């Protein structure tokens, strides 16, 4: 029984080790890598979310903490800050235009509220998943992982839909603004371009500083976990070899002692036979003597009974 437990433990450790040695891939969303500052900030939020999902279960369990929720909240606030800054700059630079253009801009940017709600939903879902994982300890980790992946897929679809909608609306309005600028607002376009460039640089700097420590920590966790699993696997293999050697020694001893045990059993059987055979013979002799006495006594009693019947 101990041998089977040791084999099962070694198989589980080997599976965990194979899972942790897979390369962590961080998918890239090309469509958010260039464009407005809010698009770059949204790309950072998107990449971080996909990166957390791509990690192994062990590293995910460590990363799904309040710190990750805070990092996502920071990226979400950075994205909405850039969207609001872009809206304020457009309103400031387009103030000479008609009032209906500014009203149209405010109406078009209302979709940014839906985008913010979706990003907040992502953070809330991560916190909910962490609580469910703690409450469902002892159940299958595969079921938790499937539920987590399903939540993220749905949230990514909503996030992508609202982001694309906002991008299309901003592109349409930006095209109108460029046409107006070409008709005489070239100064506005120059100032807006310089501010957008500064926003791109700021978002790129924030993204680099935010992403580098997380990747370094994840790599360090992966290395520590891999080393620990290798050490445990080595100890399990050594213990398994020791158990196999002990079982082999017991088997050899049993094979060596089997003939001796058979001889001892035969000798004990002969001894029992020698004990009981005299008793059986004595009982047979006594029984035969008793039968003879009974047979001898029966004829002597029969004539004595006849005179009694005649009277």
Curated annotation (Swiss-Prot):
Region 8 X 22 AA approximate tandem repeats: start and end of each range? 74-248
| Gene Ontology MF: a single term | low-density lipoprotein particle receptor binding
Which Gene Ontology cellular component annotation is one that this UniProt entry carries?
A: high-density lipoprotein particle
Q: How is it modified after translation?
A: APOE exists as multiple glycosylated and sialylated glycoforms within cells and in plasma. The extent of glycosylation and sialylation are tissue and context specific.
The segment annotated Homooligomerization runs over 259-311
Question: Where, per UniProt, does this protein localize?
Answer: Secreted; Secreted, Extracellular space; Secreted, Extracellular space, Extracellular matrix; Extracellular vesicle
Annotated protein name in UniProt: Apolipoprotein E
Which classification does the entry list for the species?
Answer: Eukaryota, Metazoa, Chordata, Craniata, Vertebrata
């Amino acid at each position: 029984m101990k041998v089977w437990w040791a084999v099962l433990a070694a198989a589980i450790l080997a599976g965990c080790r194979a899972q942790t040695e897979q390369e962590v891939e961080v998918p890239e969303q090309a469509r958010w890598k260039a464009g407005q500052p809010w698009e770059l900030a949204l790309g950072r939020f998107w990449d971080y979310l996909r990166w957390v999902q791509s990690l192994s279960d062990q590293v995910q369990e460590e990363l799904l903490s309040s710190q990750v929720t805070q990092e996502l909240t920071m990226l979400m606030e950075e994205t909405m800050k850039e969207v609001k800054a872009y809206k304020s700059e457009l309103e400031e630079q387009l103030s000479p235009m008609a009032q209906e253009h500014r009203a149209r801009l405010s109406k078009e940017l209302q979709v940014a509220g839906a985008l913010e709600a979706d990003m907040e939903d992502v953070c809330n879902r991560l916190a909910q998943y962490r609580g469910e994982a703690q409450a469902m300890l002892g159940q299958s980790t595969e079921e938790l992982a499937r539920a987590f992946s399903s939540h993220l897929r749905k949230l990514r679809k909503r996030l992508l839909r609202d982001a694309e909608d906002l991008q299309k609306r901003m592109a349409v309005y930006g095209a109108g603004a460029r046409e107006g600028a070409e008709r005489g607002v070239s100064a506005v376009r120059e100032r807006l371009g310089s501010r957008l460039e500064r926003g791109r640089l700021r978002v790129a700097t924030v993204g680099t500083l935010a992403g580098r420590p997380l990747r370094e920590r994840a790599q360090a966790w992966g290395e520590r976990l891999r080393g620990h699993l290798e050490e445990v696997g080595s100890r399990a293999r050594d213990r398994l070899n020791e158990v196999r050697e002990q079982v082999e020694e017991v088997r050899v001893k049993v094979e060596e002692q089997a003939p001796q045990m058979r001889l001892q059993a035969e000798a004990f059987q002969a001894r029992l036979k020698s004990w009981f055979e005299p008793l059986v013979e004595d009982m047979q002799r006594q029984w035969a003597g008793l039968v003879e006495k009974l047979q001898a006594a029966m004829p002597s009693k029969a004539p004595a009974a006849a005179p009694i019947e005649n009277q």
